[in-house]
Amino acid sequence: MSAVLPASAMRRVTCRELRLLGAAYRLPLAYAAARCARETKLYLHWTAGHYGQFFADYHVQIDADGAIYVIGDGALDALHAATYRRNSGSVSIALLGCVGATTEDLGAEPPTAAQIEGLAMAAAALADGLWLTIDKERVLTHGEAADNEDGVRVHAPYGPRTTCERWDLEYLGTAESPVFAPWAEDGTRGGDVIRGKAQWYRQHK
């Protein structure tokens, strides 16, 4: 777990502000990604900490009430240690919470409905600003990235389909994504649900 930040280090933003930040950092992120022979990515995480507890490793953070925060001035090209061997040219978005989560039980501080919607709205806003298609190749959970499900093979797999070292957001504990099922193809995996919601917000903004 990374360094905890005080609330005073964070700035609450709207989706419009997040979209503008994405546009402002579109080229720097694209250049950084190109140097690694890949496209700009959005990686979706949970912090494995508590609601209201901010961390230094994530560009965008979403609290239990769905409020969206950035660190300081929101520098999206800051290199944070969020996603192993994938941090250059990427933006990390994290839900605050999920301390003690297991593949059987998401614990006392699971993703809230407001957080899930906030995450989808944040992903849609950033994808708009960065000119990204919302698909698994560009917008994916840490668990999906850990198993190289986007086809970018920069490390050995360590996600929910293999070692389960990282499985962030593989399931959400909701009716849409009720259980840990990393091989599911019915749209119930957490990443599929979040991308679907992000697409909806993109179309209805």
Predicted segments, located by residue:
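Basic/polar, cationic surfaces and motifs that engage anionic cell-wall
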Residues: 1-36, 100-205
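N-terminal catalytic cores of peptidoglycan-degrading enzymes
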Residues: 1-87, 156, 199
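Structural preference for beta-strand elements that scaffold enzyme active sites
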Residues: 41, 90-92, 138
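A mature extracytoplasmic/lumenal domain signature
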Residues: 48, 74, 97-99, 143-145
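Weak global preference for isoleucine
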Residues: 62, 68-71, 93, 116, ...
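Short C-terminal domain-edge/linker segments immediately following a structured domain
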Residues: 72-77, 91-92, 124-129
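Short coil-to-beta-strand
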Residues: 85-97
